[in-house]
Design a protein with these regions (language model features):
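A charge-rich, low-complexity, intrinsically flexible signal that marks solvent-exposed coils, linkers
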Residues: 1-54
Length: 54
């Protein structure tokens, strides 16, 4: 398992299923499954941080 706090950028494959939060402001959280492509937020490429396991 990847540790809580792992980061992934828009366009990368999600390294761990769980709840991911956008780093910065504005922010949001989203459940993203391992292997899915990390999505953009508000039309921009962002960095996501794992905050909770699925």
């Amino acid at each position: 398992m990847e540790p809580i706090g792992t980061t992934a950028s828009t366009g990368q494959k999600c390294p761990e299923s769980g709840v991911w939060k956008v780093v910065g402001t504005p922010s949001t959280t989203a459940p993203i499954a391992k292997g899915n492509t990390m999505p953009p937020y508000a039309g921009k490429a962002v960095t996501w941080k794992l905050i909770q396991y699925a």
